[in-house]
Amino acid sequence: MSTRRSSTRADSTTKRPASPNSTPNAALGIFVAIARQILFIDARKVALFYLAFVTVLSFIESRIELDSTYYLVQKHSVLNQYGVKMGWFWTLVIVGPFIWFSSKAHNRRDRDQPIVDVCRLGVGTACWYFSVQFFHKVLALTSMCDKGRTLTRAQCSEKEGVWTPGYDISGHCFLMIYSILIITEEAIAYRHYQQVTDAVHQMDGDREEHDRLTRCIQYFFVAMLFLHAFWFKQIIISVLYYHIFIEEILGAVAAVVCWFVTYRMLYPAGFLASPIRRTVGRK
């Protein structure tokens, strides 16, 4: 009898209370499951889809005149002013923390690796900035005034000339598709996250911190799903209501080129590091 009591006490002392962060959250679990279905699609397929999608929508726009009086499709709408125009900001504040926390979980003993991984967003920011500057340069070079080719738009207006706008490559289309491709590439860190990090943290022991980190990663993973969905909707509006066929296509192609050069050429070649693709067998 005493032996049974002592063994019961021993068992009770070895059991640790469950971490509040490990408590199942049904709503979060549903969104994580949906996000896995969308964000784990191969980036090459995503790139091809959006190239085809923009092409088809641009063709439709060139054949059909759409009603542009709806509030949500106007440039001064809240979603355009604080969503699309601040698009790269939202990419940084959502994808950045996901990369950071995922890298911390995967590389628990390497404090420098999260910094290296986040630097990929720095490269993406440079690609976005210089691409947009290039688009502006193309617009300036292809626009002209009938009073003189070297005149600016303001100077043309002063001379009462006729201003003919040039090719305004869609910076919004570029930004949104490039952001989607970055999200798709970086989301892969969560594919085998649970199996790999569980094995790592079983050795290190700090289960409560691991659960807290996991919950944080899941929130940003779901946030990337919502950002992807928002970009999808805004791409439709941008293509159907703004720019012309060639401007939208060039914006989409530029986004795919930037993604391919960075994620499929530079990172695999050793420039910084590719997104985390570890499996249980590769720790």
Swiss-Prot record:
It is found in: Endoplasmic reticulum membrane. GO terms for molecular function: coenzyme A diphosphatase activity. Keywords: Endoplasmic reticulum, Hydrolase, Lipid metabolism, Membrane, Transmembrane, Transmembrane helix. Residues 1-21 are annotated as: Disordered. GO terms for cellular component: endoplasmic reticulum membrane. GO terms for biological process: fatty-acyl-CoA catabolic process; lipid droplet formation; lipid droplet organization; lipid homeostasis; lipid storage; phospholipid biosynthetic process. It holds the Pfam family FIT. Residues 1-11 have a biased composition (Low complexity). Belongs to the FIT family. FIT2 subfamily. This is Acyl-coenzyme A diphosphatase FITM2. The gene is fitm-2.
